[in-house]
């Protein structure tokens, strides 16, 4: 019983459940100012879009980084020379034989 009384005392001290009376006669409901709601939503969307753009750029940079695939660290105790991987040249799939003939002319 003592726990219940102390909980009620805490709730009353925090002003939970109290009736609010305004001098204007309006009900004290939660009024939402849509201007600030739209501003907050726009800021949240802008931050999210910026974060997504940053992550996409980081992933693209990591995928197309030529130096990261060619460089390897030397493990301890092994020789100092490690053969580097050679990359195959990229093919241009949009290039056709007809284009080659046009270029030769």
UniProtKB/Swiss-Prot annotation:
Keyword set, alphabetical order: Membrane, Signal, Transmembrane, Transmembrane helix
Domain of life of the organism encoding this protein: Eukaryota
Residues annotated as signal peptide: 1-19
Compartments where found: Membrane
Keyword Hydrolase: no
Transmembrane parts of this sequence: 39-59
Any Pfam family hit: DUF4514
Keyword Acetylation belongs to the record: no
Record topological domains on the Cytoplasmic side: 60-105
Membrane topology, Extracellular segments: 20-38
Cystine connections: none
Membrane topology recorded in Swiss-Prot or TrEMBL: Single-pass type I membrane protein
Main location: membrane
GO cellular component, one term: membrane
Protein name, per record: Transmembrane protein 273
Record gene name: TMEM273
